[in-house]
Curated annotation (Swiss-Prot):
Organism: Caenorhabditis elegans
Main location: nucleus
Compositionally biased spans, kind Polar residues: 63-80
SMART domains the record matches: HOX
PROSITE patterns xref list: HOMEOBOX_1 (PS00027), HOMEOBOX_2 (PS50071)
Region of interest (Disordered), ranges: 56-80
Keywords per UniProt: Developmental protein, DNA-binding, Homeobox, Nucleus
Name of protein: Homeobox protein ceh-1
Gene for this chain: ceh-1
């Protein structure tokens, strides 16, 4: 059975397009952070970027997909690093959205599974969100 087509909101599309303008390929951490920020699964973000790169290549034959569309201007804000200084102690709190903040993380307390990128996404992003 085919999966229902994802209907992205205007805000999600704007954020995805803006990220695509700066980088056509996302790292695992960038993809996870963007997915959490937009309340999408990592797979949805990954597939959107794959489809968008295909569209870009079709409209820009012969150009390198690894280079940004436009060089950042001096008045644009610089992207700050997203990794904390000590990833072991503060990485999990960096990725937690407001709905599961350290003060609100009773659901995660007492779990014996380490909070990895994979299971954090499974906890935060139910697979059938928005599909009826």
């Amino acid at each position: 059975m085919r999966r229902a087509r994802t209907a992205f909101t205007y805000e999600q599309l704007v954020a995805l397009e803006n990220k695509f303008k700066t980088s056509r390929y996302l790292s695992v951490v960038e993809r996870l952070n963007l997915a959490i920020q937009l309340q999408l699964s990592e797979t949805q973000v990954k597939i959107w970027f794959q489809n968008r790169r295909t569209k870009w290549k079709k409209h820009n034959p012969g150009q390198d997909a690894n280079t940004p569309q436009t060089p950042p201007s001096s008045d644009e804000t610089q992207i700050q690093p997203i990794l904390p200084a000590n990833p072991i102690t503060s990485f999990s709190s960096l990725l937690l959205p407001p709905i599961i903040s350290p003060a609100n993380s009773a659901v995660l307390q007492g779990t014996s599974i380490p909070l990895t990128l994979f299971n954090l996404n499974q906890i935060l992003m139910p697979q059938n969100v928005g599909f009826n």
